[in-house]
């Protein structure tokens, strides 16, 4: 990236603002049902499967839209797209608040799926990567440091709102909040224009700029890592309780994951010029080691979860920066949008698959499968490292 053509990088205040806005973005969509699922089911009589299925529908819609969103960011810049995300989310939440039946509730999740596609990590980090190239890394890490506290902030807030307003009032109030906050503040925090090469590249409709083998291995790695994270967030408490832990003990153990995620991001930010490929190997390796410890060494389950949390904490950074090793910033938005589709689709299917596996094979089989997925992700990362090394040797590039 030619730094002379770049807009000024956001300072600490704008990075912190982006982190806070991401808390609202995630809290009004992906994490919404963590608090609202039970109140919605109890009030309406709709089954929990259908209530929770709304989130899967939203993720499915996001997966279908992500390549188009990537092309749109390449063409018009992330500022307009991500600011519009606030308007779309407000519409979806308002529809949910007013939903007279299950069909309208599920339609609201279709709209929220469009909001997720245009404003969560994939869209934001795609915009930053396309604009700043590798210089986006400290911005991305800084945003994840703040947004990593999303559930810590949002779930108690949503619980209080449900207590005071009911679930419909909570959706309505949150719709107003994101409408007045996200649209104007994203426009304030993000640069106004994409750089010219990215704009020209999008207009010319350039094809896939990297080797198919690297593209597909990287895409598979991101999809498996996303599915793994989603599965663990769903089944961790169930697996721990099946192994003899009380609910209170299981919650305490699961709570170790969040601080470990944030701590590893602080360390990554302090180390500054960490090579993305090294970070990817570290992330997938620590995730695999952590889950193997959870699987085979029950007495060290706490350390296993800390190790898993540290590896998973680097995942968002890896997903945003690793493609820049092999993709020019001008092509980054389009490629990143394409890569996001399988990962989002895996996240949409994960809750259904987890429920089926636990009900048919049991929690022990579930933890075996999760450890196997983590090992597969690490193997793909090693394969990717070899492919990138071969590519760099062929083109005489420096190692990453």
Regions found by a protein language model. Give the residues of each.
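Helix-to-loop junctions at the C-terminal end of transmembrane segments
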Residues: 65-77, 264-276, 358
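Helix-loop-helix hairpin linking two adjacent transmembrane segments in secondary transporters
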Residues: 142-193
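A late C-terminal transmembrane helix in Major Facilitator Superfamily
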Residues: 329-363
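C-terminal transmembrane helical hairpin of 12-TM major facilitator-type secondary transporters
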Residues: 257, 261, 274-322
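Intracellular juxtamembrane helix-capping segments at the cytosolic ends
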Residues: 40, 118-132, 314-327
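Conserved MFS/SLC helix-loop-helix module at the cytosolic interface between two early adjacent transmembrane helices
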Residues: 64-102
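Hydrophobic core of transmembrane alpha-helices in multi-pass small-molecule transporters
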Residues: 23, 103-119, 144, 223, ...
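Extracytoplasmic gate region of multi-pass secondary transporters
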Residues: 33-37, 211-263, 268
């Amino acid at each position: 990236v030619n730094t002379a053509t770049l807009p000024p990088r956001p300072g600490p205040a704008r990075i912190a603002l982006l982190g806070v806005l991401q808390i609202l973005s995630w809290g009004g969509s992906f994490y919404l049902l963590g608090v609202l699922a039970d109140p919605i089911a109890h009030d309406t009589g709709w089954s929990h499967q259908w209530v929770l299925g709304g989130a899967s529908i939203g993720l499915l819609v996001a997966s279908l839209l992500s390549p188009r969103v990537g092309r749109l960011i390449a063409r018009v810049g992330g500022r307009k797209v991500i600011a519009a995300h606030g308007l779309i989310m407000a519409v979806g939440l308002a529809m949910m608040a007013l939903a007279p039946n299950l069909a309208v509730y599920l339609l609201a999740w279709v709209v929220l799926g469009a909001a997720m596609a245009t404003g969560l990590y994939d869209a934001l980090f795609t915009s930053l990567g396309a604009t700043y190239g590798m210089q986006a890394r400290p911005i991305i890490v800084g945003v994840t440091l703040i947004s990593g506290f999303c559930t810590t902030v949002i779930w108690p807030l949503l619980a209080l709102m449900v207590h005071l307003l009911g679930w419909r009032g909570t959706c309505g109030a949150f719709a107003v909040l994101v409408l007045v906050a996200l649209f104007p503040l994203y426009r304030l925090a993000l640069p106004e224009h994409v750089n010219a090469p990215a704009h020209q590249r999008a207009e010319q409709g350039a094809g896939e700029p990297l080797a198919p083998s690297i593209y597909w291995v990287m895409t598979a790695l991101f999809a498996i890592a996303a599915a793994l994270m989603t599965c663990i967030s769903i089944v961790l408490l169930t697996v721990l309780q099946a192994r003899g832990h009380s609910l209170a003990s299981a919650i305490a153990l699961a709570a170790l994951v969040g601080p470990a995620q944030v701590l590893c991001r602080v360390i990554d930010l302090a180390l500054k010029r960490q090579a993305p490929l090294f970070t990817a190997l570290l992330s997938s390796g620590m995730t695999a080691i952590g889950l193997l410890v959870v699987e085979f060494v029950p007495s060290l389950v706490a350390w296993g979860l800390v190790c898993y949390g540290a590896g998973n904490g680097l995942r968002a950074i890896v997903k945003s920066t690793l493609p820049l090793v092999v993709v020019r910033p001008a092509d980054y938005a389009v490629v990143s949008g394409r890569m996001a589709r399988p990962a989002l689709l895996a996240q949409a299917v994960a809750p259904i698959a987890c429920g089926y596996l636990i009900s048919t094979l049991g929690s022990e089989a579930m933890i075996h499968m999760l450890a196997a997925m983590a090992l597969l992700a690490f193997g793909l990362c090693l394969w990717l490292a070899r492919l990138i090394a071969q590519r760099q040797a062929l083109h005489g590039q420096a190692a990453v």
